[in-house]
């Protein structure tokens, strides 16, 4: 991931109807969505949306039905006309405003920069899996040898090699959506637009495909804008999340910020039943290294509040000379295969990173009775997550999720 914007929305308005100009004037006067619809017959689908997604990130647009998330997504490839504002898409070394560029420029961006995955798969029923995956390449006019190579590569990537000559009706829903993913990957577009791609699937299949998408993203590093109405899904896959209500972006933040600091009651209703264990990360929970107790007259610092686990730091801030209950100890990196119960019997402390999930910290604390030690990519001590930090994290999430309204906000359908 980089800090370079792949797509940037700048004060985007989308109005459907014949009297968009009048509707925009009323928007500027502070009129609400329902009032504008009544007065002009025009629907404000998106109102003053400003957000971005960096290269290699996943931005999730989420909200209730009618909140404007799909309407905003479809501005990126020009399927929806932007009434006001700019949608900047990185195309090579330059940026293109797809809201105002010439038609030939927009076609070029669609053909080479952007691909789309739909909720209902959008496969051609008369084409085999192989030909569905190659459809975008055929439209582009890709030479046959290159086309065949790319198609086979992407079919294998989504593990559908043995089904390449099957037709869509011969596949399960989950397999059909894998074909849709392979078709998007085959064009080698850098930006993928995914409009509730898994919502039509059974829960277990949906969760499995979410995991597959995360794994594929680790290798492909695409820029993805993903529409969802499911906060669990958004928190699981999103680098950043934009929560929308009645056409407006009400909060745009990383998942942990959404959970810990919801901006209003609408967002609090989404997070009220969230399990923080898979969302909150070590970096959010930890007691920083600078706050750890330094022992007077010694170079040791205490890694736990009881002082049973102690270490020194080298000149680069890396921990060494670990002592656990008076015995020389060792640091062992956390993994799901690690025998933590055995580690509790040895002079071992488990290490993770600022990205280690809260669930792992809970497991380490429960089975070893010691804090999780967080290290940076350079091995320097970042901090620790012990019992106190875990309780504090749970309390912060509980307080953040408290709702002060008597009932749910009215959805706009």
Locations of regions flagged by a protein language model:
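ABC ATPase "signature
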Residues: 249-253, 261, 384
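ABC ATPase NBD coupling module
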Residues: 36-40, 95-115, 261-262
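Conserved ABC ATPase signature
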Residues: 167-171, 175
């Amino acid at each position: 991931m980089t800090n370079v914007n792949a797509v940037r929305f700048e004060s985007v308005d989308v109005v459907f109807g014949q009297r968009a100009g009048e509707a925009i004037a009323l928007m500027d006067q502070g009129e609400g969505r329902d009032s504008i619809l009544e007065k002009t017959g025009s629907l404000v689908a998106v109102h003053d949306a400003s957000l971005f997604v960096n290269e290699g990130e996943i931005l999730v647009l989420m909200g209730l039905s009618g909140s404007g998330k799909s309407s905003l997504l479809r501005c990126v490839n020009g399927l929806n006309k932007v009434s006001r504002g700019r949608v900047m898409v990185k195309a090579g070394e330059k940026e293109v405003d797809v809201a105002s560029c010439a038609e030939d420029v927009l076609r070029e961006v669609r053909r080479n920069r952007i691909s789309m995955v739909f909720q209902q798969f959008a496969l051609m029923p008369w084409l085999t899996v192989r030909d569905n995956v190659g459809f975008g390449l055929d439209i582009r006019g890709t030479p046959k040898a290159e086309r065949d190579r790319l198609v086979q590569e992407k079919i294998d990537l989504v593990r559908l090699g043995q089904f390449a000559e099957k037709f869509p009706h011969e596949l399960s829903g989950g397999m059909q959506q894998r074909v849709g993913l392979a078709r998007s990957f085959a064009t080698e577009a850098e930006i993928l637009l995914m409009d509730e791609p898994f919502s039509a699937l059974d829960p277990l299949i949906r969760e499995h495909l979410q995991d597959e998408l995360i794994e594929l993203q680790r290798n492909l590093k695409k820029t993805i804008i993903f529409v969802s109405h499911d906060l669990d899904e958004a928190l699981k896959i999103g680098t950043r999340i934009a929560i929308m209500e009645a056409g407006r972006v009400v909060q745009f933040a990383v998942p942990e910020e959404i959970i810990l600091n919801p901006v209003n009651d609408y967002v609090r209703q989404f997070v009220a039943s969230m399990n923080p264990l898979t969302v909150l990360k070590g970096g959010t929970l930890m007691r920083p290294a600078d706050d750890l107790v330094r022992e007077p007259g010694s170079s040791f610092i205490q890694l736990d509040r009881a002082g049973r686990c102690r270490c020194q730091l080298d000149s680069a801030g890396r921990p060494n000379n670990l002592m656990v209950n008076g015995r020389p100890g060792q640091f062992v990196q956390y993994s799901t295969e690690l025998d933590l119960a055995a580690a509790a019997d040895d002079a071992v402390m488990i290490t993770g990173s600022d990205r280690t999930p809260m669930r792992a910290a809970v497991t380490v604390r429960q089975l070893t009775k010691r804090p999780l030690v967080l290290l940076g990519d350079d091995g320097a001590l970042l901090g620790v997550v012990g019992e106190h930090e875990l309780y504090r994290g749970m309390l912060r999430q509980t307080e953040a999720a408290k709702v002060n309204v008597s009932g749910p906000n009215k959805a706009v359908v």
